[in-house]
Amino acid sequence: MIDFDEYIRQGEPQKREKSYAWQTAIGLQAVDGLKPSDYLIETARKDIEGEITFNEAKQLIRSYYQSKASRTPEDSETYEADTASTHIRQLLTEKTFAFTLVGLTSIHRRIFEGIFKFAGQIRDYNITKKEWVLRGDTVLYVSAPDIRKAIEYDLEQERQFDYSKVDPNLSL
């Protein structure tokens, strides 16, 4: 018989970890100019305080948007911010990660599932996007046919980098 005692089932994260995950998730939305709803903030607080489980928080956010009779343009932005924040909170408190192209596309799918039809897919067309952080200018994006190879190259460079040799006094 195989002994599975060494495999411990992951439980709910602690208060500090949940707080950090929510703050990070909401902060990532702010980078894109998105602001979460007051309802998400209150629901996140309840999750952090242990008044509700994460699954209950996730369901409350989902139900909040399903119950809206009419939608405004602002609702679309808060829906994206709230849903992505909820997904990011979940990802950040899991103790799993695959440093691969498949892992990266899986993260994209899990963050944007229910928000964008293309969640988890590598784009097959070229894009430009006006970035508010660049005062409306755009960055140069990798050409669609080269994305897969560019990601694989970047991941390999990261795998080979030895962070133990970085002077901690020089790091941010």
Please give the residue ranges for each predicted region.
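FIC/Doc superfamily catalytic core
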Residues: 1-172
